[in-house]
């Protein structure tokens, strides 16, 4: 609910940042669903499935 509310209020030029490292995760496997807006993800590893599944995903790795 909060995610849908956030996405409806956000502008098209601002992309949300998901910091997986701050929450103790370093991998993005692509098993969930992503919104249609561009997303910036901070992660150490991104699987091929996640890359194929998301065209508008920007990954920042350490």
Swiss-Prot record:
This entry's Gene Ontology molecular function terms read: RNA binding; structural constituent of ribosome
Source organism's superkingdom? Eukaryota
Note the SUPFAM superfamilies from the entry: Ribosomal proteins L15p and L18e
Q: One Pfam family name from the record?
A: Ribosomal_L27A
- Recite the UniProt keywords alphabetically: Ribonucleoprotein, Ribosomal protein
One annotated Gene Ontology cellular component of this protein: nucleus
Q: What is this protein called?
A: Large ribosomal subunit protein uL15
The organism encoding this protein is Candida albicans
Q: State the organism's lineage.
A: Eukaryota, Fungi, Dikarya, Ascomycota, Saccharomycotina
Gene name as annotated: RPL28
């Amino acid at each position: 609910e909060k995610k849908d509310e956030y996405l409806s209020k956000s502008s098209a030029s601002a992309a949300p940042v998901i910091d997986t490292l701050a929450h103790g995760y370093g991998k993005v496997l692509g098993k969930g669903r992503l919104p249609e807006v561009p997303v910036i993800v901070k992660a150490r590893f991104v699987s091929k499935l996640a890359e194929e599944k998301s065209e508008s995903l920007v990954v920042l790795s350490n």
